[in-house]
């Protein structure tokens, strides 16, 4: 049976086109995906991301568990509220999931994991936690909203009780704090997102969600569907689990080597494989592509390089660049002339560094 968020009726009343996304009925757009994309880049949009899974970890051994569980190092997390992006790996070095972990107290950390991997993640985390003094708690009582765009932070802050505004305005990137709404209900606000824009992601009680959603709409924040969320994240150079990486792909093969910390004395799951890959290199890599000719890059299209064949992972039309962009996994080595097979035509594409767009600005290498 398909799942629905607390905002399902609200989305339908706003005219949203609803689709099945990882077993959840979610809005893909509210009329024009391209207009929604531009509104986030230029102003502020609100996303219902309540399909995401929130997992709280309690106990005296949470940090030792996470030092084992995650490829990035939670030893970086020393200030309450600070967050870290990491991959969770299997023993073969493949990515079980990518996630954000928050340090709240020494005996209390929080995960935000993907909707599509919920059952797998919970099973894996519980299995690993069984050797530690840790209690794993899924927070199905919480909903999640993302407010993103250059005006997003101001719009959210204006809705908070005055006693909390200053602290939220000063909140640094990849940091969170809990404040009270006007109705005195707890809001967990983090300065994170999946769009390449500034903004907040907000966890709140299910019963408070419609009230906050409507209050933000009244300020001029527009509802944004998952279609624009995908084009925004791709422009921002952000991976999508299940499309850009999975359990057969290591972080080094998914342009996520920057999330791996091979710090001394920490034997995280998959480390042996990653150490070998770092020493010897990997046989394949993820690159960014931009197509100057008309057309769209699509998942699965064949990519031809001097080193051999690869394929498009994520591809889309970029509303900001007015060109097709994509990620591709291709053989290792410096790709020179690269072509994509589109309807039996080999179309030349350029290899460019990503992100393609960051905070509304086209990156300098795009139009070289």
UniProtKB/Swiss-Prot annotation:
EC category: transferase
Gene Ontology terms describing biological process: glycine decarboxylation via glycine cleavage system
Pfam families: GCV_T, GCV_T_C
Any one of the GO CC terms: glycine cleavage complex
Example GO molecular function: aminomethyltransferase activity
Keywords: Aminotransferase, Transferase
Entry keyword annotation includes S-adenosyl-L-methionine: no
InterPro entries found in the cross-reference section: GCS_T, GCS_T_bac, GCST_C, GCV_T_N, GcvT/YgfZ/DmdA, GcvT/YgfZ_C, TrmE/GcvT_dom1
Catalysed transformations (reactions): N(6)-[(R)-S(8)-aminomethyldihydrolipoyl]-L-lysyl-[protein] + (6S)-5,6,7,8-tetrahydrofolate = N(6)-[(R)-dihydrolipoyl]-L-lysyl-[protein] + (6R)-5,10-methylene-5,6,7,8-tetrahydrofolate + NH4(+)
Organism domain of life: Bacteria
Enzyme Commission number(s) of this protein: 2.1.2.10
Residue pairs linked by disulfide bridges in the UniProt entry: none
Signal peptide region: none
Complex formation: The glycine cleavage system is composed of four proteins: P, T, L and H.
Cited function: The glycine cleavage system catalyzes the degradation of glycine.
Similarity comment text for this entry: Belongs to the GcvT family.
Name of the protein in question: Aminomethyltransferase
Organism: Xylella fastidiosa (strain Temecula1 / ATCC 700964)
